[in-house]
Amino acid sequence: MFGGLMPAMVTPFDERGELDFEATEALVERFIQAGVSGISPLGSTGEATHLTFDERKRFAEEVVKLVAGRVPLVVGVGSSGTREAVELARHAEGAGADAVLAVSPFYWKVGEEALFNHFATVADAVEIPVLLYNLPMLTGIELSPALISRLAGERENIVGIKDTVTVYGHVVSVLQEIKEANPDFAVLCGWEDLVFPSLLAGADGSICAFANVAPELFVDLVNSTREGELQRAAELHRRVLELVTLGARSDPPIGAIKLAMGIQGVPISPAVRGPALPADEGAREDIEAILRDAGVLNPSKAR
């Protein structure tokens, strides 16, 4: 159920910084038309930590309605506290999400037993599938293959992981130590640079941020690799590596991603929530050049 390309969906805001559901609808339709295998809102790229609790619930409800069961919807429920993560997971299940994505707690640097209790408690609170989210570069905590294996072995509804790491060896370890024993456990790469090699090693797909900008490129990369068209996939991988350089044009990359989406003709404001900063308009030419070099700039829609 969980594989292929799933964009880590941005959260559109209007010029006043409020949730923009018209832009959200346009984005959902763009993803569906691009042939994505699922959508994952309210993660890091979705600025979930910059939203109020009520906004997170409202956005989840709206995206469930807009997707309308056409592709699996994996809603982020990450929180630094277990109780809040449980409430968000229960809400997502009640709203109609197909699964939830639970990131490591990200304030206290807790040990593996505390991490096990956190994820197990979230899994016990719902009946729908739970995907773990390993994001050590932001949380300061790396989920070890041993912990992942224990969670998957002791909780039937923990069915996969979004592994956002810069070290390829971690993905390989997860594949070797967990997926070989449990082929149904979904391994989804969250780091664009590693999508192609992860797929070659046996990963099921990707949940990634830059698919917001060029979903067709990432869908093509995943499908070409799966179908054994490796020469084509290698060229698509090169284009992905070019595309992700636009992330350096804002702090964090979300602002540059939203500006790039607007350049591509997506009706979305470049607005982000603090402490994130929007991309400077002076970066527009640089971003257009990157989109062109990556072979994804649509001149008829660029604005």
Where are these regions (language model features)?
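Alpha-helical structural signal in soluble globular domains
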Residues: 34, 58, 62-67, 91, ...
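Catalytic alpha/beta core domains of metabolic enzymes, predominantly
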Residues: 124-125, 137-241, 246-249
